[in-house]
């Protein structure tokens, strides 16, 4: 009677040993305060990761059993680990291109505003449009910028830099000339053009009026798209954002990033309702996408 039990015991021990020996080892083990999202166990001490999958979570000693000679271990102490954030409304390419352009968000005086544009102009070839900026005129008391601030500094570059909320932009005289916009231009519905008392344009265009200049700005090249998306992905990853819903879908650029092994962000491209037939045909042809 005892011999069969002993045989079964040693058989189970052998199986358990084989399982331990053959159990996959983690590529990465993270130790810290890890939030799980589970009501009955909201926090654990560690998690093991292999490839792009979480193998297990639990107490430190439990998870460390998945450690091998090539396992990287990150000790975070009391730092908090949470799932990646999802931003459901972004303009991803525009954000990335802005990161590559002149930075005006924290300019605190008209002089600093103008000098930053001038310095950036020196770094790009003549004729290059200077865009983005994300300026905030409230930083220097509320006076709107004027094209006279930058015209002498940007004679070789058309400039159309935008306020941080996107609702107004400043054009220099070269941009106005390329767009064929003069002092006699009429206001358009849903927008306004700021003028001096004698009717001379200051260079500020608001809301729908911005289109008078925007329609003359060249589309970004594939190189610029790829650079902008890369910068955007790196930036959001540095802030814990792992998925985005892009209001201006750039699927071709993201496909290139994917094929080159450079995609860092899960991506959902959003199209306007007016393009539903194009989206339908694309889904019928290519499917709904994959996990990325």
Where would I find each of the regions flagged by the language model?
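Divalent metal-binding segments
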Residues: 23-31, 35, 39-284, 290
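Positively charged n-region of N-terminal signal peptides that target proteins for export
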Residues: 1-4
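Hydrophobic membrane-insertion alpha-helices, especially the h-region
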Residues: 6-18
């Amino acid at each position: 009677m005892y011999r069969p039990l002993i045989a079964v015991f040693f058989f189970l021990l052998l199986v358990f040993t084989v399982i331990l020996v053959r159990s996959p080892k983690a590529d990465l083990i993270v130790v810290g305060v890890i939030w799980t999202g589970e009501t009955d166990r909201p926090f654990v001490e560690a998690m093991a990761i292999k490839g792009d999958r979480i193998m297990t979570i639990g107490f430190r000693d439990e998870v460390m059993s998945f450690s091998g000679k090539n396992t990287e271990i990150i000790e975070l102490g009391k730092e908090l680990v949470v799932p990646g954030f999802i931003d459901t409304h972004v303009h991803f390419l525009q954000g990335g291109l802005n990161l590559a352009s002149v930075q005006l968000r924290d300019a605190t005086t008209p002089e600093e505003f103008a000098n930053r544009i001038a310095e950036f102009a020196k770094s790009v070839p003549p004729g290059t449009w200077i865009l983005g900026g994300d300026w905030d005129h409230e930083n220097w008391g509320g006076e709107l910028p004027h094209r006279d601030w930058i015209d002498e500094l940007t004679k070789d570059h058309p400039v159309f830099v935008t306020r941080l909320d996107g609702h107004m932009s400043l054009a220099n005289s070269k941009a106005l000339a390329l767009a064929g916009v003069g002092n006699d231009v009429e206001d358009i519905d849903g927008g306004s053009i700021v003028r001096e008392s004698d009717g001379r344009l200051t260079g500020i265009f608001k809301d729908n009026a911005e289109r008078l200049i925007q329609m003359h700005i060249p589309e970004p090249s594939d190189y610029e798209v790829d650079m902008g998306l890369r910068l955007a992905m790196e930036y959001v990853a540095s802030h814990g954002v792992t998925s985005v819903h892009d209001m201006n879908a750039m699927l071709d650029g993201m496909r290139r990033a994917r094929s080159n092994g450079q995609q860092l962000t899960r991506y959902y491209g959003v199209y306007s309702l007016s393009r539903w037939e194009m989206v339908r045909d694309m889904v019928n042809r290519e499917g709904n996408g994959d996990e990325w």
